[in-house]
Structures are given as C-alpha cells and as structure tokens.
Amino acid sequence: MMLNDVRPAIGAKKRKKRVGCGESSGHGKTSGRGHKGQKARAGGSIRIGFEGGQMPLIRRIPKRGFNNKLFHVFYAPVNLSALQGIQQEVIDESLLRQIGVVKGKWDGIKILGKGEITQAYTFKVHAVSASAKEKIEKAGGKIELIKSTP
C-alpha cells in the first residue's frame, strides 16, 4: 500500500450540516429551529437549571452540611520501616524525595510508627505520630517539627 492509496474509513469524515439552503434540502426556511419561540431566535439559549421563572430545583431543595476540605492538610505518610539503612543523620523532605520514599504533591511529611528504628536520626518533618515519636526518642533521635504552609 502506498501513501497516496490511504483513505479515511467510511463514515469518518462527516459533512457539515448546511442549513437555510432551500426547501428541498430539508433544512430550509426555519433551518431546523421550528417556528418562533425563544429557541428559534439568535442567542436564544437558556442557562442550565432555568425553569421558565419557576423556582429552580437547586433552590427548592434544602441545603445541608459543610466541609472544610479546602483547608485540609494532606501529609505524605512515611513509616519507620521505610527508613531502614539510610546513612544520613538528618532526614528531611528533600532526602525522602531523593531516595524515592515520598513521591507526588503533598502538603507535608508525617512519620508513622510502623516498623523499628535502631539508628539515631534527626527528623525535620511536619508531623509525627505518637508511636513514631516514642520509637525515635527511644533510639536516641530528635524531632524538629516544621510548620506546614497549606
């Protein structure tokens, strides 16, 4: 097959609907808009949810609840088990991203207590769980909490 033999699949190219081009075309006179009325006029589209002046459904039903997700802080969870064998003494976000423990967009880092830790590390993170704090201090490590900026 040569490049000049390539043709689009049947039905792949659809002709534009030409309206107002004579009665026999099937789209003449009113151009498929029917007779009179708001939808027949130019710019005669009505917004979504408009019910002709009647109180719209979205305003008729009661409003309930509240959420504060806009201000929620999403921490990247890091377990102590993931930190085994790290040679550096100071563990911060840049190091965790460099070794691939933390990936993606997060508001901060939270150290969780799953696993054991033997070496004394200094953690510069945004949050620490109670069990992780206990294990870190037991191993002789320190925790420096960073204030997270959402």
From Swiss-Prot:
GO terms of biological process kind: translation
Chain spans, region Disordered: 12-43
TM helices/strands, residue ranges: none
Coiled coil: none
Keywords, alphabetical: Ribonucleoprotein, Ribosomal protein, RNA-binding, rRNA-binding
Biased segments, Basic residues type: 30-39
GO terms under cellular component: cytosolic large ribosomal subunit
UniProt superkingdom: Bacteria
Pfam families reported in the protein's UniProt record: Ribosomal_L27A
Gene Ontology molecular functions: rRNA binding; structural constituent of ribosome
Cysteine pairs bridged by disulfides in the record: none
Stated role: Binds to the 23S rRNA.
PANTHER family hit by this protein: 50S RIBOSOMAL PROTEIN L15, LARGE RIBOSOMAL SUBUNIT PROTEIN UL15M
Family from the record: Belongs to the universal ribosomal protein uL15 family.
Subunit structure: Part of the 50S ribosomal subunit.
Record protein name field: Large ribosomal subunit protein uL15
